[in-house]
Amino acid sequence: MTHSLRVIFAGTPEFAAAALAAIHEAGFPVPLVLTQPDRPAGRGMKLQASAVKRYALERGMAVAQPPSLRRAGKYPVEAVAALDLLHATPHDVMVVAAYGLLLPQEVLELPRHGCINIHASLLPRWRGAAPIHRAIEAGDAETGVTLMQMDAGLDTGAMLHEARVAIAPDDTTATLHDKLAAAGARLVVDALVELERTGALAATPQPADGVTYAEKIGKHEAALDWRKPAAALARQVRAFDPFPGGAGTLDGATLKLWAADAVPGRDDAAPGTIVDIGPDGVVIACGEGALRVTQLQKPGGKRLPAREFLAGAPLAVGQRFAPADAA
């Protein structure tokens, strides 16, 4: 099936590529794709194209990679060229998903039907850069995807559609990301079909109550504070997989802790102390309960199940991880 609604797409990572693929496969014409410039990545730090760029080029779509869209910003020449291209490209709506660049008012007002953003939370909860991580870290039972009509604020636009997704007890940011990417892809296609059929989407202003912000994840957040309850640390480990991971410092070496669950603890063990070691994992005392770590990684090594890790890097009951503020 083909459609007449012309969609300019703006996005960068895999989350966005899933939406672009769904839009393209549904038969909507995509005259232009915007994505971030190629970035150094990997061990060799070679320039790599974004997931969106790779998908678009494989299917013969036109791609633009401006470093900015602000006429008065750091890259005015590139921004003006990109804006001229947008003005010259006939389209009806822009779909934005994890693009990574601010859209000036000029761009927001350019499409006949405005700009629709795919956001990975149930707004107004978890506005901002890291909604998937923060939902898991906070212990939310569910999250979802919201389509919103973009305005000049940070994820403050009126809501158009939403899809709810349960957070499983073993979900990591990686697994939940994939669920939300698939949900967002389905949601945006349904919305575009409705927009083409009816000419408008019903918009509901976001409520003033329940607003929270998902701050960008920093590498420093990997350090586990053993004084916290084990349940909170288990959520932190899941939330920070694949980035930045959980981390603990033992005898001066930083170990990455990739999978863990909360288990009953011992009252006589100081937080951070290894209280048990077995094939099922390394059990570490916490402020409340204990954390059983089932997947670890030593510096320069690979992430391994506890049994394999212990075969090459023996640990001992009584060893103690350094406090987070001393690591």
From Swiss-Prot:
Functional description taken from the UniProt entry: Attaches a formyl group to the free amino group of methionyl-tRNA(fMet). The formyl group appears to play a dual role in the initiator identity of N-formylmethionyl-tRNA by promoting its recognition by IF2 and preventing the misappropriation of this tRNA by the elongation apparatus.
Task: Tell me if Plastid is a UniProt keyword of this record.
Answer: no
Q: GO: which molecular function terms? A: methionyl-tRNA formyltransferase activity
Its source organism is Burkholderia pseudomallei (strain 1106a)
Q: Which family does it belong to?
A: Belongs to the Fmt family.
Name the chemical reaction catalysed here: L-methionyl-tRNA(fMet) + (6R)-10-formyltetrahydrofolate = N-formyl-L-methionyl-tRNA(fMet) + (6S)-5,6,7,8-tetrahydrofolate + H(+)
Q: How is this protein annotated for GO cellular component?
A: cytosol
Q: Output the Pfam families linked to this UniProt entry.
A: Formyl_trans_C (PF02911), Formyl_trans_N (PF00551)
Keyword Membrane (UniProt) = no
- Top EC class per UniProt? transferase
The EC code for this enzyme is 2.1.2.9
UniProt binding sites for (6S)-5,6,7,8-tetrahydrofolate: 121-124
Q: What is this protein called?
A: Methionyl-tRNA formyltransferase
